[in-house]
Design a protein with these regions (language model features):
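Short active-site oxyanion
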Residues: 25-31, 103-107, 154-155
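A contiguous loop/helix-start segment that scaffolds small-molecule binding in enzyme catalytic cores
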Residues: 154, 158-224
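Glycine-rich, flexible N-terminal cofactor/catalytic loop recognition
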Residues: 1-57
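Conserved helicase motor
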Residues: 54-61, 134-136
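Loop/turn-to-beta-strand initiation segments
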Residues: 3-4, 73-78, 154
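Class I SAM-dependent methyltransferase SAM-binding "motif I" and its flanking Rossmann-like core
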Residues: 94-151
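Glycine/small-residue-rich loop that forms an oxyanion/phosphate-binding "nest" at active or ligand-binding sites
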Residues: 56, 64-113
């Protein structure tokens, strides 16, 4: 029986790619990629020529069974996403779950993810935190924010740049205008930036300065 490797890829700077990740991607029989065009650029940079197959949120329900069967047949497979660690707000959970259910060894390499550097750079308490990722856009969003209003741990969210100010305004309604928070964007890229302050101050900043790039919001938990 083969093995499934979950391989993180850089969220920005290609120098964040590990030697081990490169070696694994060169050795496996098949690479499952969220977007073969995006991953193709990465693989070409590191001279990785192995076969790629598309594996994303639209088709993963259909491809999981065939992938599991190939691993059962002795092939080694690597799972990558466009950036970061597969399964963290990206496709990956389904194939990992099915491999576990079928007794297939799953090995996840340590590596890049956007929320950890954003959390550390925020300056907010990080001994305990909760990762919320992307909140629902419509149904359930307000319910979830209401449930988090009493959360004591630091909270971490992903958001798109064009919805950032609206999201911060919603946070103000549920967490209070004076709640400390930070917004990190373009982690590990040329224009990386972290802005810290109260939710109101962040709204003012990003209303005046249109945000671009991938966004991580870190919000302090409620004080005792």
């Amino acid at each position: 029986m083969g093995k499934l490797y979950v391989v993180p890829t850089p969220v920005g700077n290609l120098e964040d790619m590990t030697f081990r990740a490169i070696r694994i991607l060169k050795e496996v029989d098949l690479i499952l990629a969220e977007d073969t065009r995006t991953s193709g650029i990465l693989l070409k940079h590191f001279e990785i020529k192995n076969v790629m197959q598309s594996h994303h949120k639209v088709n993963e329900h259909k491809t999981v069974e065939s992938v599991v069967n190939r691993i059962k047949g002795g092939e080694t497979v690597a799972l990558i996403s466009d950036a970061g660690t597969p399964g963290i707000s990206d496709p990956g959970f389904l194939v990992v779950r099915e491999c576990v259910r079928n007794g297939i060894e799953v090995q996840c390499l340590p590596g890049a993810t956007a929320f950890v550097p954003a959390l550390v750079a925020s300056g907010l308490p990080n001994e305990k935190f909760c990762f919320e990722g992307f909140l629902p856009q419509k149904k359930g969003r307000m319910t979830r924010l209401k449930a988090l209003a009493g959360e004591r741990r630091t909270m971490v969210f992903y958001e798109s740049p064009h919805r950032l100010v609206k999201a911060l305004a919603q946070f103000t309604e549920h967490f209070g205008a004076g709640r400390q928070a930070s917004v990190s964007r373009e982690i590990s890229k040329v224009h990386e930036e972290t802005v810290r302050g109260t939710l109101t101050e962040l709204i003012e900043h990003f209303t005046a300065n249109e945000p671009r790039g991938e966004i991580v919001i870190v919000v302090a938990g409620i004080d005792d």
